[in-house]
């Protein structure tokens, strides 16, 4: 986000944490998504930009629009809950002997056919003595309803369960009133303040009514409801710093103080990543953190959110264990792979750059590979004319491996997939905007940076030996971000009191 300085970001984090800790045991305060400042990426900080960008009259007009949007969305959500209640599927009866619960994500339809979970892989089976002793609950981001997904899971005899979109009518109303009450409290506390401190509280008050905040509290009640049926010893979630993760931990502790909450830090940790590193009230903190590599383990140990023995390097499926001798730079390929993140604004930035480079370097090919959350068809339709005029630019629907094999350069911003590209011998180039905080996940490595076509031209004209040498150094450093999966390390959790 341009013109959002590090000083503003640090001030924002401090103020949001202060508001959270004023009611450190209140689930509705902890469930307010806007108070959990995840990291410095534009995807996350764009929601806070009006605090610093707008003067009073513009800011309050913005607040009014946010309030109106939240109320309309809330009304439509509750209307849907009411009319769909008679046809809602019955709750799944759970095996009381289940010892481990995993909360994961179904990001796209193709994930349904996977034999293993996208994030945890074989850990649910490895961690439990028997296959029937673990279950994976999915946050559903596919085009299928949870009811349809669960029929498919039963057909495949999988120990998977897609969480419903909503709870009962009564519970949904209870969530809304709880968040509304806390929103009024935050707004009341803002009356004696001025400037940006006041604006932060006013935005938090409005965002207490958002669907994201409702989702976090809903995850609390989902977890509580699950634990009414079974008494697991271990609960796993992905761990990025989102409010819903903390609410799952709190619900588990509410039902059983002895349950062990484990967060899996599966992605890279950014330079200014905040919510993942900061401690809240005990019941909202994980008991253990599994990291994806040595670098993540070191960063979290320094944060002191947990003792060192409770931060364990589990590894990641993102690293290729078969690549022992890293691939070297291949100058003869002349293809550039673009890796935008799962945000349409980020996709637009990368697509525009691809067309800009295409106009100046017509002999090269440009492959834009999108995140699973992005609709390729939607973007193909939008950029139909430009794609016809620039035949050397294509939006990929191939496998990642095929795209990597065809390319020798990779242009990225905040994606962690760049690590896999580096492993495969692609020369990394970070695309930055003027006057923005860096969102480079490889911020502590000497990576070439471009702002436009002129910068890119300088890189491709560099001596090939220099690029090969630099890539080797980058590859050596990058091995610390993602380690091969080590299930034995994860099992150490069972031996630590």
Question: What is the predicted function of each stretch?
Answer:
Residues 1-497:
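Catalytic-core helical/loop segments in enzymes performing group transfer/polymerization on anionic/lipid-linked
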């Amino acid at each position: 986000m341009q013109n959002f300085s590090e000083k503003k970001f640090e001030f924002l984090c401090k103020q949001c944490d202060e508001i959270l800790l004023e009611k450190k045991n209140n689930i509705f305060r902890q469930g307010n998504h806007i108070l959990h400042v995840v990291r410095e990426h534009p995807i996350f900080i764009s929601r806070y930009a009006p605090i610093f960008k707008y003067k009073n009259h513009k800011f309050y007009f913005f607040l009014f629009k946010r309030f109106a949007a939240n109320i309309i969305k809330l009304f439509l959500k509750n209307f849907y809950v009411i009319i769909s209640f008679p046809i809602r599927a019955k709750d799944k009866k759970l095996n009381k002997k289940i010892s481990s619960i995993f909360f994961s994500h179904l990001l796209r339809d193709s994930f349904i056919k996977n034999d293993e979970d996208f994030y945890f892989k074989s850990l649910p089976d490895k961690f439990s003595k028997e296959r029937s002793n673990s279950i994976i609950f999915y946050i559903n981001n596919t085009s299928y309803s949870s009811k349809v997904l669960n029929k498919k899971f039963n057909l495949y005899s999988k120990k998977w369960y897609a969480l419903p979109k909503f709870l009962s009518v009564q519970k949904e109303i209870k969530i809304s009133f709880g968040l509304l009450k806390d929103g009024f409290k935050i707004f009341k506390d803002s009356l004696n303040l001025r400037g940006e401190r006041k604006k932060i509280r006013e935005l938090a008050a409005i965002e207490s009514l958002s669907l994201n905040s409702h989702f976090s509290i809903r995850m609390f009640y989902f977890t509580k409801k699950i634990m009414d049926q079974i008494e697991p010893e271990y609960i796993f979630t992905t761990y990025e710093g989102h409010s819903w993760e903390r609410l799952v931990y709190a619900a588990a502790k509410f039902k059983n103080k002895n349950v062990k909450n484990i967060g899996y830090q599966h992605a890279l940790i950014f330079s200014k990543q905040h919510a993942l590193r900061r401690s809240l009230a005990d019941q909202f903190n994980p008991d253990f953190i599994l990291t994806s590599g040595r670098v993540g383990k070191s960063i979290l140990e320094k944060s002191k959110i947990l003792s060192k023995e409770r931060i364990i390097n589990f590894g990641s499926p993102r690293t290729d264990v078969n690549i022992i001798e890293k691939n070297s730079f291949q100058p003869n390929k002349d293809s550039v792979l673009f890796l935008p993140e799962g945000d349409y604004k980020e996709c637009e930035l990368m697509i525009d750059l691809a067309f800009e480079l295409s106009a100046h370097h017509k002999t090269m090919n440009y492959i834009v590979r999108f995140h699973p959350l992005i609709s390729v068809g939607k973007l193909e339709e939008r950029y139909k004319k430009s794609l016809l005029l620039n035949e050397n630019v294509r939006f990929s629907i191939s496998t990642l491996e095929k795209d990597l094999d065809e390319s020798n350069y990779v242009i990225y911003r905040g994606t962690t997939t760049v690590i896999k590209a580096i492993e495969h011998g692609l020369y990394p180039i970070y695309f930055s905007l003027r006057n923005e905080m860096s969102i480079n996940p490889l911020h502590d490595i000497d990576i070439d940076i471009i702002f436009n076509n002129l910068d890119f031209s300088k890189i491709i004209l560099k001596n090939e030996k220099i690029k090969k040498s630099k890539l080797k150094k980058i590859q050596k450093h990058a091995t610390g971000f993602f380690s091969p999966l080590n299930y034995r390390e994860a099992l150490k959790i069972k031996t630590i009191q």
